[in-house]
Amino acid sequence: MQYELRLVEFDDVLPVWQNKLWPGRQSPIKPMSSMTLDRQYDMSIYDNYEPFFWAVYHNNEIVAVNSGHQTNATEFRSRGLYADPAHRGKGLAKMLLNELLVCAEAVGCNLVWTVPRKGSEHAYLSAGFVFLGGWFNEGMEFGPNIYSVCYI
């Protein structure tokens, strides 16, 4: 199968997030999040950084997405990783995460972090992420989740 990775816009990934990754989500889906790795919230993220969005296409249809943005000068967050079940196991998540790692390094970050959902462990481990602490549900609409980091 032919897959094409593209840098896209928020409006391209939003329908996938709304309908497939976070169906029925109560909180608004924004291009970025104010969450930080130390489990705090920093509203200045919205003013200081720009988000990046990627999609993997197959036959001109989006089959996988991810996004990322800085949360401070040296840390970059991966957010919204999703691969269509019919296309899982083909390395698409790893492709997206590797592209995100390249982007994070290009903007001067040395650490990428994320809060993956249970069931997606393999994708993150295959891209070099390690898990921090244990699984939790508190504060998450779609848990359980775990903090995870990858050092660049």
Descriptions of predicted regions:
Residues 113-115, 130-150:
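Conserved catalytic-core motifs of GNAT/GCN5-like acyltransferases
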Residues 70-81, 88, 140-141:
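A conserved beta-turn-beta hairpin within the catalytic core of GNAT-like acetyltransferases
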Residues 17-53, 57-58:
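Active-site rim helix/loop that mediates acceptor-substrate recognition in acyltransferases
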Residues 104-117:
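Conserved GNAT acetyl-CoA-binding A-motif
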Residues 1-11, 152:
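Conserved N-terminal entry element of GNAT/NAT acetyltransferase domains
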Residues 17, 124-125, 129:
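Conserved active-site tyrosine of GNAT-family acetyltransferases
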Residues 83, 89-102:
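Conserved acetyl-CoA-binding loop-helix of GNAT-fold acetyltransferases
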Residues 55, 61-69, 77-82:
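Conserved beta-strand in the GNAT
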